[in-house]
């Protein structure tokens, strides 16, 4: 099956909750894939089974202080950035990277933080085409697996990776 992903409109319910359709992967025997024509391209195709499900999403903002990295794998943190334009690659690297390094170190207690990349995405077709930005991902997914997480560490820090893999490490997305 090949389909162009269409955005699903969310419907407000109450107290910051919304009903939305989330597309999950459905096992069909076909290997799932996503093809994009690259940054700025409007050509996006996906394959593999699609299992759309209507779900109720609750805002976590009211309980923001209850979430912890150790228990939930995420937490809500307020951060005021000095970045004025998130489409400016130079600002992101020179201002936001150091901000995120300090933020993750302070929030996680990590002894070392390495900011290794970022991805700009937008659902606005005109902005995506004009600024050569990638499209949003329209499937429920995880970015790293048991195999790809350690492999990413090897790719980023090849000379240190094997020693670092003997200790605890985390890939934190901000």
Language model: regions and residue ranges:
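Non-heme Fe(II) oxygenase catalytic core, chiefly the N-lobe of the double-stranded beta-helix
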Residues: 4-173
């Amino acid at each position: 099956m090949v389909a162009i992903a269409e955005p699903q409109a969310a419907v407000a319910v109450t107290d910051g909750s919304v009903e939305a359709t989330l597309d999950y992967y459905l096992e069909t025997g076909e290997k799932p894939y996503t093809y994009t024509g690259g940054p700025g391209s409007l050509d996006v195709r996906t394959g593999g089974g699609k299992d759309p499900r209507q779900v109720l999403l609750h805002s976590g903002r009211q309980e923001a202080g209850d979430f912890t990295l150790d228990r939930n794998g995420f937490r809500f943190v307020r951060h005021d950035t000095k970045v004025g334009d998130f489409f400016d690659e130079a600002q992101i690297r020179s201002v936001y990277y150091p901000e995120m390094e300090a933020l993750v170190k302070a929030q996680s207690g990590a002894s070392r933080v390495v900011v290794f990349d970022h991805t700009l995405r937008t659902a606005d077709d005109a902005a995506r085409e004009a600024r050569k930005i990638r499209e949003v991902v329209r499937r429920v997914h995880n970015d790293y697996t048991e195999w790809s997480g350690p492999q990413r560490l090897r790719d980023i820090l090849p000379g240190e990776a094997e020693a670092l893999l003997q200790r605890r490490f985390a890939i934190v997305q901000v």
